[in-house]
Amino acid sequence: VFNITATMTTNIKNNDFKDVVFNRQSVRQFDPAVKIDRAELQTIIDETISAPSACNLQSWHFVVADTAEGKAKAKSVLMKFNYPQIDSCSAMIFVLGDTQSHLVYRDVWNKACEEGRITPEKRDEIFKTFLPMYENATPEFLQADAMIDSSMAAMQLLLIARAHGYDTNPIAGYAADKVATTFGLDPKRYVPVMAIAIGKAASQPITTTRYDGSQVTEFC
């Protein structure tokens, strides 16, 4: 089943764009008493995948560790300094890139055509333009492409979670070569991009200092 349209939600608690974006902070210690039910976690992901992706390939995959067993698996691949997050968060979401997303590309656009979103001519044009590039691509290209798509989704997930009233911590400190197999996925297909702890902060997070924009900008 392909849901191409963005999901509208009734769970948004904070619809203040400025607050969601500019007051988001990473949290390392969560309130362990706070639990997020799976229905809301699924809604958060449903909203997350309205993020943009190259050629609408949607090259992302999510593993949600929200049980004791799942968290134990997550902890087994995390670096020790990230244990406080997994021990206290409501759930940890691993965002992975799917290097084989192009194999179902026809299904996505055929569905769009059936629903009258695009004409058969436009669909065929899309197939001719983009599919050969991916079908003949190197593994390195497919991995890089999937990581870009999934990075877009990961950032969106941080903001969607905050809009739902939750705090997050994006994590890259894990054994990347063990993530897929730990969760029963094909490591040749799925490449880990980020782990995201989600829950409610146990205390007010520290505000970080940022570089001035002029220090990291070039105009030409």
Where are these regions (language model features)?
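Acidic, surface-exposed loops and disordered segments
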Residues: 2-220
